[in-house]
Amino acid sequence: MTAYDVVIEIPKGSRNKYEVDHETGRVYLDRVLFTAFVYPADYGFFENTLGDDGDPLDVLVLLEYPVFPGVGIKVRPVGVLKMSDEAGGDAKIIAVQHKDPRWQHIQDVNDIPEYTRKEIEHFFARYKDLEPGKFVTIEGWGDAAEAEKIVQAGFANLEAQGH
């Protein structure tokens, strides 16, 4: 499986929603989540991609310990949580650190413990509940092959934009 570069914006356990300004590279506090939820894993984006929402593809990285905003990690996709929000399609690729022996047994979304998948799905289903005009629709899980196709499409989308 191919390894990809991602940048973490939000560490596991945070309510702060950080975003990287892609022109300056600076990390900004976008908002504090309106709900009492915390991110269930480190959250960021795939470099050099463009998702359906016009932003780089989102990624949730399962790690032993959280990292801090701005850290780059080589990951391999193992699945995808298919969802949409008020801006359109908003798939969340689920990945693990490439070559970390603690995660080698996770090759596909079904290798992730069921309870962990439920936590991730519950977080994304409810984390915007108190924000006016925002919503999320969960559409289900996809396997590693589907996640890989979405990542490849993200690279192609950015290239088609002339970048």
Curated annotation (Swiss-Prot):
Keyword Cytoplasm set for record: yes
Organism lineage: Bacteria, Bacillati, Actinomycetota, Actinomycetes, Micrococcales
Residues annotated as catalytic: D90 (proton acceptor)
Functional description taken from the UniProt entry: Catalyzes the hydrolysis of inorganic pyrophosphate (PPi) forming two phosphate ions.
Coiled-coil stretches: none
A Pfam match: Pyrophosphatase
Keywords: Cytoplasm, Hydrolase, Magnesium, Metal-binding
Binding, substrate: K17, R31, Y43, Y127
This protein's GO CC annotations: cytoplasm
Subunit structure: Homohexamer.
Enzyme Commission number(s) of this protein: 3.6.1.1
The protein's name in its UniProt record: Inorganic pyrophosphatase
Entry's localization field: Cytoplasm
UniProt: Mg(2+) 1 binding residues: D53, D58, D90
Binding residues for Mg(2+) 3: D85, D90
One GO BP annotation of this record: phosphate-containing compound metabolic process
Catalytic reaction(s) noted: diphosphate + H2O = 2 phosphate + H(+)
Family: Belongs to the PPase family.
Source domain of life: Bacteria
UniProt GO MF annotations: inorganic diphosphate phosphatase activity; magnesium ion binding
Enzyme class: hydrolase
Residues engaged in binding Mg(2+) 2: E9, D58
Cofactor: Mg(2+)
